[in-house]
Amino acid sequence: MRSKNLLVATAVATALAGATSAYALTPAVTAAIPADHQLVIAGASAARDAVEAGLSAATFCQAGTFNRYRVATTNSPDLRAYSCTLATGSPYFNDTIENDNVVIFYRSEGGSIWGPGAIAKNVPVARLVVNASCTLTDGTNYLCPVSNYNLANDGQTATGNITRTLVNLGVADLEPEMFSGANWVEPGTPLGNEPAAGVLAALPAVPVIGQAFGILVRSDSPVAALSVQDITSIFTGNYGDWSQVPGSGTTGPITICRRERGSGTQTGADVFFNGQNCSPSALPFVHSTDNPPIFGNTVIENSTSSSLGTCMTANTNSIGISVANAAPTGTKFVTIGNQAPGRATAAVGSYDYWFEATMTKAGGLNTTVGLIADGLIAVVQDDTTIPTVNSAFALSGLGPVSAPNAAVLPVSTTRPVALARRGSSEGNSCQKPQAQN
């Protein structure tokens, strides 16, 4: 009898893992969710807020069923997971999967390139594991133990709640082809060498949201405004001292706090200011080793946004790059062309330093996994679910087929829709924003 009861209990638990529930999914239930209801995402940290906002929408996940999982050590490595029961009657996905339990893994460690890059190379990447080792901290938030992670080998020697799997959906701050050349990862990582010419460009990327980026200086710096020409001159090493920058009001050798290769923030700065991957006469971005500044001033490469903020506060006369949300402690954003960075100025067309974030589905996905991915793309595109952070805004023409995003004046102060797009419906970071008819 005991054996029979055990079999019944096991069958019930398995059924619950893939069927209806009206409560937040426990780690045990989440761990039992079958593979065809698991979606593995990798890539941009800047776009992660948009994904989480979409998942939090009651039209995607049923209210009260959403749980969030993170690594116990804050933001390093940045591996996350979300579980919930899919909503009924949702405009975002096929009704064959509504009311099902799903788990979505999001790996943003290393930045954008680890999404489309891993898909292009067909290599597994590190992601979180959800099980009974994850402990509830508050409400719906769990922390899971991971130790000894190293980006250089992407966790191959790490221990704890970590594994390596192929990527189903890549998220990047720009279209995949922008991550070639100087913006492919440093040599020696599991991603290996850059794929053959044309492979990244051929990936089926779709734009999802607009994101504004900005230039940081220290809070105690008198520098408040810079031109595109000034910033390009600094990032190419042609300005090495603030005394060379017209109207800076200060002097001293400039320290450049940049991001690592493969970061969407770094790639965007390289594209916008230096023309990388857009012009045959593109200028190389300063680097600590293979392209040092001609004046010999310091360049510090940072693997995360938080470490870049630390770099800024630790170095007098520093300059850095960031998605245009709240400036890190001890720093401030400058205006570019007398325009402050943010969703409102970007959406209305007065601030050009922004890009269309993209999502790329891997080929050959299981039907159910593909439906979950399609639903996630749709909810992230929707202007009603865009996160209310300063950097993010919706793109016109995207969103639900029944009610696509529409650009109107005056633009919303919380969830604006851009009056213009970069290039065609597939996005083109090399083109200036223009109205879409």
What residues fall within each predicted segment?
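Bacterial N-terminal signal peptides that target proteins for export
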Residues: M1-V8
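Sec/Tat signal peptide C-region and signal peptidase I cleavage site
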Residues: G18-A24
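Bacterial N-terminal signal peptides
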Residues: A9-G18
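Flexible loop/hinge segments at secondary-structure junctions
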Residues: A24-N437
